[in-house]
């Protein structure tokens, strides 16, 4: 004979199909009042578990400085061995009024092309990269401070989405780009023969940049003139950086503060802790190590 809890479970399942509870209880020889009491106990356990999860969700939300929404928090909890649905995480976040920072719109920019750049091919168009160090995307973005502008050059791995080299300077000479690429090559010697893709800006068409690529056996690639989305991987990273690292005003107080914040974000957070949607919510470092 089935236990009362087994019968209550059957009653609940059949009731969802349209059968009346009184008829089911009578047919299965179960107490109707006992059935309702079992529902109350079940709801109480669920409520207790939900209350217990609130602290965990809030702790992760604050740990990631309001950068994580329900999907990434859910992945973090699963990684800790905590079984919970993404739907419940979202519900708890709404109850607590936790809302992740909204990503700023991705606004790709155009660059001025040179005659020399027009002869360089786009080697990444239509390609799918299957492991790290096959291709880097490079670009420059502006960093506003109350002390004036800074310029940030970076190179991101097409596969792992790891920032492999970056430099910050107060102007935009070609050395801004060669400096960030040199850092990438020192840290990741397996980049030899990789494709280095960029737009057609003057820093990327300079003699010293091309000479550096040739010396290291790297393949130069440039997007088509006026096609902004050719370099969307790193443009998207700039958008993420400015949403999650920059002040809400978009302007840092000092240049020193900006440099420190960007260093901390890339080295201590983005590369090693931030789950990336295109990597099945793995960290860039995890994608590198798993390849």
Regions flagged by a language model, labelled:
Residues 2-8, 25, 32-131, 227, ...:
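Basic, flexible linker segments flanking DNA-binding modules
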Residues 43, 214-218, 240-291:
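C-terminal domain-tail junction helix/linker
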Residues 44, 83, 128-130, 145-146, ...:
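Conserved, non-catalytic sequence blocks in retroelement Pol enzymes and Pol-derived host proteins
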Residues 126-164, 170-172:
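An active-site-proximal beta-strand-loop segment
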Residues 144, 148, 166-189, 205:
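Active-site beta-loop-alpha junctions of metal-dependent nucleic acid enzymes
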Residues 110-112, 198-200, 206-209, 220-242, ...:
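RNase H-like two-metal-ion nuclease catalytic core shared by retroviral integrases
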